[in-house]
């Protein structure tokens, strides 16, 4: 597809009955304080100057092609697809939660699995935010499936959170209860790194008092624990203060931890998400042991020139493969071919 055609492509992202409010991402539309950040599935709308909807009729009224999100028991998505087909809207579907453990949990229910199968086969196609989810979709249909990593506005200086005089280690995960997140192991590893390098640690913990006590019992020399949520821009500012973002996640997720690191112009160490594997091939968890990742992290904490070089290479990769321009071209080409 010609770049001019990609520039004119608009996408309606539909999350039927979802919690997020209707939101437009026009070229000249500035972000609002209470609007959703242009990340995750909102990024598909943002990179095409499209919009996010929760009401099917509103998405249909745009006359744009639709990306229909599958969530919950898929009943609302099934009804929405029927309306979209009746209105002859070109519609592709995507699982809203695409970590390996999340897909397995969602589709373990027989009725939900049957509904998923029907939706995937009746839609014009499917988009996956991870290569593994794309392969899973292809088990149910032979064509019309695309791996489209979630784009990030790395080319937009309004989202450039580069910062001088960084210090410390930011722990990218926060879920103790999900085994594949390896959050406990990450904290233990970071405790060791902090002891050796004298770098402070920051972690978010929205769990119960028991989890806060567990962190306290680890005996960090200097740790900052955030127990309250903050808006995305404030969160990025917090991430950007640190030398590295560290995680041991093995969930095959889309990779927002690495995406946050890209906007912070920092380095993500560990994790096997899609963005981690694309943007941080030198430091991601793919085919690396936890011990190797700890070694990499320790080296980067004490070698500023290497850390800056890896961050710069990640930014260059992202501008080529993960930017809003790249995302818009991928989506426009995919929908045109359906």
Segment roles from a protein language model:
Residues 301-336:
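A charged, aromatic-enriched C-terminal amphipathic alpha-helix characteristic of glycosyltransferases
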Residues 99, 132, 147-159:
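Short beta-strand->alpha-helix junction loop in the catalytic core
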């Amino acid at each position: 597809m010609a770049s001019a055609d990609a520039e004119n492509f608009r996408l309606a992202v539909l999350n039927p009955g979802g919690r997020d409010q209707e939101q437009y991402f026009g070229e000249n539309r500035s972000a609002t304080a209470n609007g959703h950040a242009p990340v995750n599935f909102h990024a598909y709308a943002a990179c095409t100057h499209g919009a996010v909807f929760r009401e099917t009729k509103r998405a249909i009224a745009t006359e744009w092609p639709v990306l229909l999100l599958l969530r919950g028991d898929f009943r609302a998505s099934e009804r929405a697809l029927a309306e979209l087909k009746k209105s002859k809207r070109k519609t592709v579907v995507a699982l809203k939660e695409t970590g390996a453990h999340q897909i397995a949990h969602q589709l373990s229910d027989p009725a939900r699995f049957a509904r998923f199968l029907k939706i995937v086969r009746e839609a014009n196609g499917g988009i996956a935010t991870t290569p593994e989810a794309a392969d899973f979709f292809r088990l149910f249909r032979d064509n019309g499936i695309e791996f489209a990593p979630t784009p990030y506005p790395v080319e937009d200086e309004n989202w450039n959170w580069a910062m001088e005089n960084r210090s410390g280690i930011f722990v990218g995960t926060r879920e103790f209860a999900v085994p594949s997140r390896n959050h406990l192991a990450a904290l233990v590893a970071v405790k060791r790194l902090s002891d050796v390098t004298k770098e402070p640690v920051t972690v978010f913990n929205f769990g119960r008092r028991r989890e806060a006590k567990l962190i306290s019992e680890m005996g960090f020399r200097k740790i900052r624990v955030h127990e309250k949520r903050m808006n995305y821009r404030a969160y990025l500012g917090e991430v950007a203060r640190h030398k590295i973002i560290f995680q041991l996640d093995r969930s095959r997720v889309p990779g927002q931890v690495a995406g946050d690191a890209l906007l912070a112009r920092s380095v993500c160490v560990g994790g096997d998400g899609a963005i981690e594997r694309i943007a941080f091939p030198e430091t991601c968890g793919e085919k690396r042991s936890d011990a190797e990742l700890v070694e990499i992290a320790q080296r980067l904490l004490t070698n500023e020139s290497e850390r800056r070089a890896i961050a710069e290479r990640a930014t260059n990769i992202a501008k080529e493969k993960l930017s809003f321009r790249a995302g818009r071209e991928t989506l426009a080409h995919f929908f045109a071919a359906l």
